[in-house]
Amino acid sequence: MNKLNKKDFSIFANFLNKLAKDLTKLYYSKLSKNFKVSNKLRGKGYDPVTTSDKAFEKFIRSKIADKFSNHQIIGEEFGHKKANSDFTWVIDPIDGTRSFVIGGPTWSNLISLNFNNLPIMGLVNFPVLNKYYINEDDKSAFVYEKQKKRKITVNKKATFNYARLTAAFHGHLSFEQQKKIPKIFSMNNFPTADALSYMQVAEGRLDAAIQCGNHIWDIHPSIPIIRAAGGVVSNWKNQEITSTDNVLVTPNKLIHNKILKLLKPIS
């Protein structure tokens, strides 16, 4: 899947660990107040973007350019910076902009490092919650919370019958489509919160997260962390996620395959 050795992982992990701290400082010093909000859809719906989204992305891009000037960058707000490199950084400056706009705590900064278009390292940073998640190689994932580091793993005792599930279908599935997956709605459902839901599977607090219409910047940063924590992630057809797609995250293949079967009528 990748050609990174231990030294490579260490270089990128050190960069992302520092970047997480810098992003949190930037939020509290300059971006938490007096931001402006606009609507990307302009009368066709509501997809908010703020001046803080753009400032975060510019900051992240500048840090990447300073350290890895030959790498490609894809960001939600400023598009694709192409380069002659197999490495691409994928950025969602604020995942959960609606939460950000109303002063909620569950929005995050998302960054992945992709090699040959597949994510190999990820950072999910929650400035307000004062924690961030990261994989420091392909077999170990961690949460840094209140300056303390803790290794995370999925719930290894999870079973399908007692799986704790979160699903975000609003705005994506019609009522007719939802009627085709009744079992999903009869499972142990919990609130959903964008990338936080994926991280809650990675650290064993949830046993399944289902989302619709994720862009690569919405999901790629979480994928290496989930897999390094022992989890399983795919689209609803059990394929790698390489473009905008529906997402399923679980702690093991047994639960994964059973939920995929439940989703099959609409996948």
Task: Enumerate the predicted regions with their spans.
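DPxDG-like acidic metal-binding loop motif
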Residues: 83-142
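Short hydrophobic/aromatic-rich beta-strand segments that constitute the beta-sheet cores
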Residues: 134, 141-145, 167, 208
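Generic detector of well-ordered alpha-helical packing
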Residues: 54, 77, 93-96, 127, ...
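N-terminal subdomain of lithium-sensitive/metallo-dependent phosphomonoesterases centered on the IMPase/IPPase/PAP
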Residues: 1-94
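Short helix-loop capping/hinge motifs at secondary-structure junctions, enriched
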Residues: 139-149, 254-258
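An extended, acidic
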Residues: 153-267
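Residue-level signal for inorganic ion chemistry
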Residues: 23-27, 53, 64, 97, ...
